[in-house]
Amino acid sequence: MVVGSNHTRRGETGSRFTNSSSSSSTSGGPTASASSTTSVTSSLATNSTSTSTAAALLSSMSHKSHGPPPSAPPSAHHQTNQQHHQVAHSQPHATHYQQTNQHPSHHHQSHQSSNGSGGGSAGSGSGSGSVVSGLNGCNGSAVSRLSQSTGMSPRELSENDDLATSLILDPHLGFQTHKMNIRFRPLKVDTQQLKAIVDDFIHTQNYDIAIQRIYEGPWIPRHLKNKNKIATKRLHDHIVRYLRVFDKDSGFAIEACYRYTLEEQRGAKISSTKRWSKNDKIECLVGCIAELTEAEEAALLHSGKNDFSVMYSCRKNCAQLWLGPAAYINHDCRANCKFLATGRDTACVKVLRDIEVGEEITCFYGEDFFGDSNRYCECETCERRGTGAFAGKDDGLMLGLSMGLGLASSGPGNNGGYRLRETDNRINRIKSRANSTNSTSNSNSNTNDSTGPSETSSTNGLVASGGAGGATGAAMLPTPSQQSTGGKEATAAVSLLEKKLPNVVVSPLTMKELRQKGMTKYDAEMIMANAAYQQQHHHQHHFHHHHHHHHHHHNHGQHASTGAEATAAVQQMAAMQKPGVGGTGAAGNAGATTVSSVAAGAGSEVNGGRSTSLRKSMRVNSTSSSISTASADEVIAPVVAASISLPSKAPVVLMPRCKPAQMAIAALHQSQQRQLRRSERQKEKLTDGESSDTSSEQQKKEQKQQDHQLPQKMFSLAEEPQPEKSEEKQQEQQKRVTRNSAGRVGLVARLATAHNNNIATTTNSSSSSNKATTITNCNNHNSNNSSRINHNSNLSSRLSVKSRKPAPSEASSIPSSTSSENQQQQATRRSCSPTPAYKKNLLASFDPDPPSTQGIKEQLKDESVTYSPVKQKRSRRAAALAAAQSIHCEALGGFPTGSTGSQRKRAQAGEPTTSCSSTTISNVEPLLKTPERRLKLTLRMKRSPILDEVIELGTSLSNGGAGRGAPGSHREGTAGEGSVRSALNLTGSSSNGIEYEILRMEGISEHGNDDDEDEEEDDEEPAAEEEEEPPPKEELQLVNKKQRKKQRSRSRSSQRRSPAPSSVYGTPQKKRLRLIFGNESHTIDIPPAAAEGSGSGLDDLNSSGGGGDESFNASYASSTSLTVNTSSSSTSSSSGVGGATSTSAEPVDSSTVGPPIAAQSPSSTTSSSFQSACTSTTNSNSYFPNGKQRAAGEDSYAMHYYQLGKFAGTPSPGQGQAIVSSSSGSSGGGGSGAGFLSMPKHTFGTCALLAPTSFACLQNQPQISQQKTSSGGGAGVVPTSTSTGAVTSHHHTNNHHGQK
């Protein structure tokens, strides 16, 4: 059987693959999978096409990559840095795969799993090469023969293999290998028990006991136990095949492999455990074949997801599914084994040349399995020869590589020239040398990272493997003179490669270590290159052209403002502990880099912000199409270039992220960078949790530093924007830095809002997510800032979250202005970043951790206030109330911005604590943005919209609306939950003919709360609307249960939604919501809410308030979260949306209720609204049916009174929306309710866009807040941080809605 060139390998990291796909970087799955199923020859056409496409993409990426090593598309190439050798073969696939989502992943995955004629598993990194893939033959082993006569169907083979690998291999390896079932769910059992069974078998070698224990466990699905004897026997035999892998006499072992990019550096490989001689048969290494009909191919295979182990049989002229232990054999262009048919449907492996202990067992998948002539192959041989994915990386780099390997004196490996024969002994010597160099390299790179440019370059060498550019980026990191690095870069890259290429080959860091650093090797390389790169940019504003080469390093912000910063970043990388990864850690964990860079010097904040954004952006970009510049820097650069005409926007865009001059270059490099970031982000995503940990700590430091360095930040920004926009940027940044002037900030915010609106309008299509994010950013002003630009900010937001804690003091002084400034910039950035990629980024960037951290920080801040005795709360409320009243008055007066600004000032002055809490959030994340989170809401069309409407209207339209707005109070007042729901429903039901209720929420979350919140976040508006309205009939019955849950999520969502002051400024006139239903995504343009008096001016939030009546910005009076958009009747409901849901989940002690009531006492509507806000803050618990609701009764009455007075006749859209973001100490409610859903459909869509940040805050708050919220209204869920950031969150949410 001829190895099918298109055969894809069964990757161990099916799950990873999926992740990749979510990340876009590696997950683009090989669309060529179908083609990959075809044989090399017969399917060559298909494969060729996909391959050529991949090749083209790859080559284009390659070029970019050459220029800037960190290009995501070339990620395969770049990953080659650390993966360099490994990547060479596999990576191209990954690259191709990433790019075309077709062939590469195939190749990569294919080689591992595919047992097909294509049978090589190209990516050992993929995790499992399909030994059998090359051959269509049967398994050689007796076990394989067990099923010979009764060959399994492809579906049965897939099921049995998925189960067998999940029972035996996955527990042993510690991660989930590739699965044929793309919806495979990990067994809900204690994997330690399964691991113990395998470990015991390794000691006892007793198959019967092991199989008996496996069959007796709870992990065998019931339906498999009910199968007939033949089917049961087949499963038994397949399990035995995998157990034989652990037989002491098998002569091989399955190990984790981190070479191939396809699996994001985590796959499996087969290593020899004894010496094999030529012509030996490895009997236990068997694979099973199941012939695929075209119908079965269509039904079972999903391109780029599970077509990794499909091969084409030239003998049978059909595609075959290859599964079994041999599917984990990876491909190598100089393979030491081949597949040998042992029966009709089994194959084993025959040794082609002597294999030493510890050597990887590889097979040749085919001549064109990984693209034409295997141009995307990442195998060790291709790495050594400088071919495949490693070809054309960079002459210097390749030279360094080949020289490092001792293969040639002058890059003969590339092509041409003489070189020594590749004898086993020579190759082994090279490997041993590389190994010895590896350890040295590791220490060197760690040392060098912190030490110097050349060393950094060496660290970047990994990145450089992608090309000299990568190395240069790293090298330049330390050196300000990066312009000249072009030539130096190559040399440095070469020298570094010589040192580090071995590193790459050896894979010095374990995947675990990398993940702990929050990145994959490739990410590390890219980040290091980027960090260096950014430094280059930073140092060479003038040399943008030069930078330009490294432009994908392009995160200018990331590049250290100063050499010191660069060094700090490098050091941080070193701290991250990976020579290559360390750098990435620094850059990738921009937070880390940022921290060190911030510490480094004046430019540090820029650098820090950039690096964090870079990392996040990478993640985002991986997910997002190349369109959105994943990193804030990137986005900024392109946006800046595009919107240079918009000075305001430019400054915002430029922030520290981009230099005007670079903007033009940015446009060129952005695509590259985006791709780089894509891959990085993808990897980062995988390692997000770990990286977030490290980066969080770093970011804490960083933010502390940043807080102290805000002025420095200003300066660095000033330095950076030398071009036309530099002045504006400087000004804006300075404003940000000197967030002290709330008034100025307010003005800036307004301007930013105007600009944002313009920009948003301009970039509306892609900006839907971006705008939503902008709101989110506004909410978490500082933290979201970067986030906005980089959704990638996930990391940065995390970092920023932790930083926030340190920043609270500073926040208090700067908060108001900062938030507006940040908001402005964020909005601008957002507008800039509104590329389609942004949406992807949005989706990809939901970082449970960052938002959580952010939320926690906000919580901490709020809670710091909240923790203070209730008195503080009350005083805060009083201050907030006063501020709110004045604000409301101003707003009513029709001076939304002015009122906002003064409100902020007053709130700040009157409520320093509150202000601090609120602003801390904004202040903390000038650079960092909270990534958006994506929630998966399963919505069900409400059974009887009319009935629901009637119920909601009947339940007290006005009260219902108010209840909605003040979740606890109004609910209580009107029908409790019913009224809340009705508030949303009112908006939704009356406006929308059809309403949906949330059937199920699935979110990506790190914390239990996150899931709900995430979902809510994504669908927050719909969720709010639906949650409130979903069970109109049920609601009364299920009120307690459902409403509690809904309220909690709602309060979270509302807090998220309630547009922060930023939304007040920056909400574009036109809002866009992005709804994702299953595979469909709909973008809904929400017409600008009818400008209701000054309300429209204020923002969606305020605009829905109809002149800011209730929409005094809760964020300004951080405790005054009652951003109620009372004019619910007006279209402003879109902004109101956030408010409606803004009911704060955080319960406030009943004691709080008292103050709110007091607050209510003010007769003025503004004060009422404020009171409501306070009350709702106090009574947020009441929002949740906890008994707190009762406590909220008074509040709710007040709210009702207030809202009724306010809305009187406008009960429908969200009267009740007086958002009570009852963040316990910080009334972050800031929900602009009322108009919440003038346009329910929009609202519906908006939910998807809810910023994860608010969600994170909500989520985090539960942790912190719950401690504080004894009144277990579950309300604790709404973190104080949420409330503090509640305003922000709410605003953010509203902005989301509005912008979306």
From Swiss-Prot:
<keyword id="KW-0597">Phosphoprotein</keyword>
<feature type="region of interest" description="Disordered">
    <location>
        <begin position="956"/>
        <end position="988"/>
    </location>
</feature>
<dbReference type="InterPro" id="IPR039977">
    <property type="entry name" value="Suv4-20/Set9"/>
</dbReference>
<feature type="modified residue" description="Phosphothreonine">
    <location>
        <position position="930"/>
    </location>
</feature>
<dbReference type="InterPro" id="IPR001214">
    <property type="entry name" value="SET_dom"/>
</dbReference>
<feature type="modified residue" description="Phosphoserine">
    <location>
        <position position="831"/>
    </location>
</feature>
<dbReference type="GO" id="GO:0042799">
    <property type="term" value="F:histone H4K20 methyltransferase activity"/>
</dbReference>
<feature type="compositionally biased region" description="Polar residues">
    <location>
        <begin position="822"/>
        <end position="834"/>
    </location>
</feature>
<keyword id="KW-0539">Nucleus</keyword>
<keyword id="KW-0158">Chromosome</keyword>
<dbReference type="GO" id="GO:0000792">
    <property type="term" value="C:heterochromatin"/>
</dbReference>
<feature type="compositionally biased region" description="Acidic residues">
    <location>
        <begin position="1009"/>
        <end position="1029"/>
    </location>
</feature>
<dbReference type="GO" id="GO:0140941">
    <property type="term" value="F:histone H4K20me methyltransferase activity"/>
</dbReference>
<feature type="compositionally biased region" description="Low complexity">
    <location>
        <begin position="435"/>
        <end position="451"/>
    </location>
</feature>
<dbReference type="GO" id="GO:0140943">
    <property type="term" value="F:histone H4K20 trimethyltransferase activity"/>
</dbReference>
<feature type="compositionally biased region" description="Polar residues">
    <location>
        <begin position="452"/>
        <end position="462"/>
    </location>
</feature>
<feature type="region of interest" description="Disordered">
    <location>
        <begin position="756"/>
        <end position="856"/>
    </location>
</feature>
<dbReference type="InterPro" id="IPR041938">
    <property type="entry name" value="Hist-Lys_N-MTase_N"/>
</dbReference>
<dbReference type="GO" id="GO:0032259">
    <property type="term" value="P:methylation"/>
</dbReference>
<dbReference type="Pfam" id="PF00856">
    <property type="entry name" value="SET"/>
</dbReference>
<feature type="compositionally biased region" description="Basic and acidic residues">
    <location>
        <begin position="722"/>
        <end position="735"/>
    </location>
</feature>
<feature type="region of interest" description="Disordered">
    <location>
        <begin position="1006"/>
        <end position="1188"/>
    </location>
</feature>
<feature type="modified residue" description="Phosphoserine">
    <location>
        <position position="833"/>
    </location>
</feature>
<feature type="region of interest" description="Disordered">
    <location>
        <begin position="432"/>
        <end position="490"/>
    </location>
</feature>
<dbReference type="GO" id="GO:0141005">
    <property type="term" value="P:transposable element silencing by heterochromatin formation"/>
</dbReference>
<feature type="region of interest" description="Disordered">
    <location>
        <begin position="891"/>
        <end position="927"/>
    </location>
</feature>
<keyword id="KW-0489">Methyltransferase</keyword>
<feature type="region of interest" description="Disordered">
    <location>
        <begin position="1263"/>
        <end position="1300"/>
    </location>
</feature>
<keyword id="KW-0949">S-adenosyl-L-methionine</keyword>
<dbReference type="GO" id="GO:0040029">
    <property type="term" value="P:epigenetic regulation of gene expression"/>
</dbReference>
<feature type="compositionally biased region" description="Basic and acidic residues">
    <location>
        <begin position="677"/>
        <end position="688"/>
    </location>
</feature>
<feature type="compositionally biased region" description="Polar residues">
    <location>
        <begin position="79"/>
        <end position="97"/>
    </location>
</feature>
<feature type="compositionally biased region" description="Low complexity">
    <location>
        <begin position="1161"/>
        <end position="1178"/>
    </location>
</feature>
<keyword id="KW-0156">Chromatin regulator</keyword>
<feature type="compositionally biased region" description="Basic residues">
    <location>
        <begin position="536"/>
        <end position="557"/>
    </location>
</feature>
<dbReference type="GO" id="GO:0140944">
    <property type="term" value="F:histone H4K20 monomethyltransferase activity"/>
</dbReference>
<comment type="function">
    <text>Histone methyltransferase that specifically trimethylates 'Lys-20' of histone H4. H4 'Lys-20' trimethylation represents a specific tag for epigenetic transcriptional repression. Mainly functions in pericentric heterochromatin regions, thereby playing a central role in the establishment of constitutive heterochromatin in these regions. Acts as a dominant suppressor of position-effect variegation.</text>
</comment>
<feature type="compositionally biased region" description="Basic residues">
    <location>
        <begin position="1041"/>
        <end position="1055"/>
    </location>
</feature>
<dbReference type="GO" id="GO:0031507">
    <property type="term" value="P:heterochromatin formation"/>
</dbReference>
<dbReference type="GO" id="GO:0140719">
    <property type="term" value="P:constitutive heterochromatin formation"/>
</dbReference>
<feature type="region of interest" description="Disordered">
    <location>
        <begin position="535"/>
        <end position="574"/>
    </location>
</feature>
<feature type="compositionally biased region" description="Gly residues">
    <location>
        <begin position="116"/>
        <end position="128"/>
    </location>
</feature>
